[in-house]
Amino acid sequence: MKTFARRGFMTGAAALLALPMFRISPAFAQAVKMSIGVGLAQEPGALVVRMQQEKLLEKAAQELGLAGVEPEFLHFPVLLRMLQGIAAGQLQFGTLGSTPCIRALTLSDPVVPIAILGGGNTFPLQVPPNSPIHNLDDLKGKTVLTIVGSDLHLVLVRMMNAQFGTEDLKALGINLRNMNALTELTRAQPGVDANLSLIPQAIAAERAGDLVTILRNDGKTGAAYQGPEGKGAGLTIASFAKTPFAPEAYYPHRIWLVVRRDYLAANPKAVTALMVANQRAVSALTKAGTDEIVKTGSANWGGTPEAQKDWIDTVLWKRRGWSWITEGDASTLVGLSTTKAIFQTPLEPDAARKIFAMGADVSKAAYEATGRFPERTVFDDSRSDVRGRPVWEAASWNLKA
């Protein structure tokens, strides 16, 4: 474990052991304590590094009239530890993919999503170069490497459901092998026929000649594809039209910044300050360009710098240039939660709207503090990523399963 002053990183379980339970109201303290769990190996890592380098959180807090903040960014390579810290009150903030976020929102005391810190991963389905697997039909009876119960597992289930009309992978003869480390995705593994991977690891594996891509999360085929649509990369698989979130993806990937509900109620200005800092980091890095983003976050990411550059150009905050939650973003959680092979309890539309609405005031305050960017009309712009009314208009949202 290594610490870097008060704003440095601590890692995993050691970080949780070092933290007190959150019980003291900042009203009785000169500076507001903020414990923020992050996954540096994902795209939020670059935003966090920029916030630290430029002291964006401290500056935003001062602008909002806070006496001061004491941020502690804590790196969690294992998501379970972060979830445990949030549930126990040892972390006030966390970064979650949609799969753990849905599970967290169905609890009795849910977290509140307040910003988008990433998304857009293409989750390639890959095989060794000499594999007889060329399409989804060929995957029947085979073994797939993934992380069971994760976003990767969710992508595989939704691919197969669109193609075959069932979420039951066992009924299709597909066996799952649970990986121990992300590095396993960069090459063929003994006893495994295919990897449901993620980028940048998959890009690096393909460039090294270790794996080839059949299909991506956006419905586009890879170089190894052979099927009714033709051969090679860049085709759209026919069954992709059956997925509810086309044309974006089988799984419209998002990474959410979430906050404990009690902390949000007690510290709205501190939450607003973090959102302001995050948006300023997004704006600065987007303007700086891909090379600067990779330079900022590369040390914590997998794959080669060249693969990271290709990956960053797909990241949602890089493409949008802003981090606000929209009605369309929220609707993806409601829709995805109906995937029974992954989730035991669906996220009810009205319950979801009420949870998101808890962050409406702080989101609007952060939007105004950062110059009201983008213009309101941008939210209604028809793009490949689902948009819609911003979260400060959540009272008028119409979420549907």
Model-identified regions with their sequence ranges:
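N-terminal export signals
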Residues: 2, 8-28
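Extracytoplasmic "Venus flytrap"
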Residues: 33-54, 148-153
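Short, polar/charged alpha-helical segment
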Residues: 42-75, 105-107, 158-162
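Pocket-flanking alpha-helical
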Residues: 44-50, 74-112, 123-134, 153-154, ...
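Flexible hinge/capping segments at coil-to-helix
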Residues: 128-143, 167, 266-269
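Pocket-lining segment of extracytoplasmic ligand-binding domains
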Residues: 188-298
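Secondary-structure end/capping motifs
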Residues: 264-348
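Conserved C-terminal helix/tail region of periplasmic/extracytoplasmic solute-binding proteins
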Residues: 338-401
